[in-house]
Structure formats: C-alpha cells, structure tokens
C-alpha cells in the first residue's frame, strides 16, 4: 500500500547550500521532518548546480518521511545571469537595466520546458520574453 500524503512544501534553496538555518530549518521543522536528512540529500543531488537558486517541491508523508523534486532555476534568475545584472528594474517600462538576445531567451525557454505549462517552444519563448520585459531587460535580435 502506498504511503499517505499529508502535505506539500515549496522552497527555493541554493544548490549545494542547504543548511538547517532559515528558511529550510523552520519550514521543515514545523512539519516534523528530519532537517539534516533533507539537507544531506538535497546537497548531494545538487552538487553540480552549486549556488543556483532551485525550487524544490517536498512531498510529506504521514510517517514523517518525505520525497522531493528539484525543478529548474527560476526564469528570472536565468535572465539575470544571461543579461549580467544583479536585479530587475523597479520601473520596467521606464528604466531598462540590461539587454538579452533572442537566442539566449530561446536557450532559457528550452531548459525550462519541463516546468512550463506548454509543449510548444515558441510559446515558452514568449513566456520567458515577457518575464524579461517585466524585469526591465531589453530583448535584441
């Protein structure tokens, strides 16, 4: 018989850098999960993605065990990395903070395809382009 699921938990943690300190510790501790076990497993599975922000979906079972799925880095983080900026614009329609090419947008869209709600690369590219524009990043040919 399958384990009974009692809840889900979403976190964003830097790859290879999960520690029992906030935000990981309090979030897992409040659900009664083994914090160190999660940190060890997460760090082992994300050694190759050191320093990248990674969304994690944790499935919590009734016997206080867990499974987790690591998603691809957020589109905004990928855009900031490709555009070479530290943060987006607070007034994206007035202040442009960086420039990114369409080829970089397509590359980000292709890497995020599994997490986006589309099966069409063109639609995914438009989603990523919209994120870039809302951050104040100009897209050039």
Curated annotation (Swiss-Prot):
Keyword RNA-binding applies: yes
Keywords: Methylation, Ribonucleoprotein, Ribosomal protein, RNA-binding, rRNA-binding
A single Gene Ontology CC term: cytosolic large ribosomal subunit
Family designation: Belongs to the universal ribosomal protein uL11 family.
Quaternary structure, from the entry: Part of the ribosomal stalk of the 50S ribosomal subunit. Interacts with L10 and the large rRNA to form the base of the stalk. L10 forms an elongated spine to which L12 dimers bind in a sequential fashion forming a multimeric L10(L12)X complex.
SUPFAM superfamilies: Ribosomal L11/L12e N-terminal domain (SSF54747), Ribosomal protein L11, C-terminal domain (SSF46906)
GO molecular function: large ribosomal subunit rRNA binding; structural constituent of ribosome
PTM text: One or more lysine residues are methylated.
CDD domains: Ribosomal_L11
Domain of life: Bacteria
Function: Forms part of the ribosomal stalk which helps the ribosome interact with GTP-bound translation factors.
Disulfide bonds: none
Name this protein carries in UniProt: Large ribosomal subunit protein uL11
């Amino acid at each position: 018989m399958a384990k009974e699921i009692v809840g889900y938990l979403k976190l964003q943690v830097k790859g290879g850098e999960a520690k029992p300190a906030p935000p990981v510790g309090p979030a897992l501790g409040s659900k009664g999960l083994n914090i160190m076990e999660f940190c060890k497993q997460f760090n082992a599975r994300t050694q190759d993605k050191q320093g990248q922000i990674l969304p994690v979906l944790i499935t919590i079972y009734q016997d206080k065990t867990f499974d987790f799925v690591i998603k691809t880095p957020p589109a905004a983080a990928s855009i900031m990395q490709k555009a070479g900026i530290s943060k987006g614009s607070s007034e994206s329609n007035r202040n442009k903070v960086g420039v990114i090419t369409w080829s970089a947008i397509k590359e980000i869209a292709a890497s995020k395809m599994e997490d986006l709600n589309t099966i069409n690369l063109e639609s995914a590219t438009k989603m990523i382009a919209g994120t870039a524009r809302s951050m104040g990043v100009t897209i050039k040919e």
